[in-house]
Amino acid sequence: MKKIFDTTFTIKEVVATGIGAALFVVIGMVSIPTPVPNTSIQLQYAVQALFGVVFGPIVGFLTGFIGHALKDSIQYGNPWWTWVLASGLFGLVVGLLKNYLRVAQGVFESRDIITFNVAQFVANALVWVVIAPLGDILIYNEPSNKVFAQGVVATVANGLTVAVAGTLLLIAYARTQTKSGSLKKD
């Protein structure tokens, strides 16, 4: 049986977390606005998905949590903690795919692409339509119609962004990995 969470945290994973969070911040500074206030199309979730799938759920969580907290602090002066948590949880859920996808073995084919995209759309819906809006209502006393509208737009925008850019990143990453049995003795 495969472990869902490995309790060890390697130097490689610490470095990956730092790089992932830094990329989350830098890429997150470029966003495409939507008609819904405080909601935009953001490419950093594709990178977070890559880091989650390659390095696992803890790196996926920390990449989003730290990256979003820093990005909000730089852009707005302070983090919006419910959405910071949602970003982290997105990375955690997608990171659970590490043991089920075959990117580390150099394989990311139709079955893997479908599994990845179903999981990331479910993760996006969970964090942006359920967790972030409920947190906004309970913690920040935000109007429910506003936060659920933001959540739906974020789910669609992030889901499509990760479906396209995240899939392309994972295909590219898988191609850099050596497939088992691909080396032959001359």
UniProtKB/Swiss-Prot annotation:
Main location: membrane
UniProt cross-references to InterPro entries, sorted A to Z: ECF_substrate-spec-like (IPR009825), UPF0397 (IPR022914)
Keyword Transmembrane assigned: yes
Subcellular location: Cell membrane
UniProt membrane topology term: Multi-pass membrane protein
TM segment ranges: 14-34, 50-70, 77-97, 119-139, 152-172
GO cellular component: plasma membrane
Keyword field contains Nucleus: no
Protein name stated in the entry: UPF0397 protein SGO_0469
Source lineage: Bacteria, Bacillati, Bacillota, Bacilli, Lactobacillales
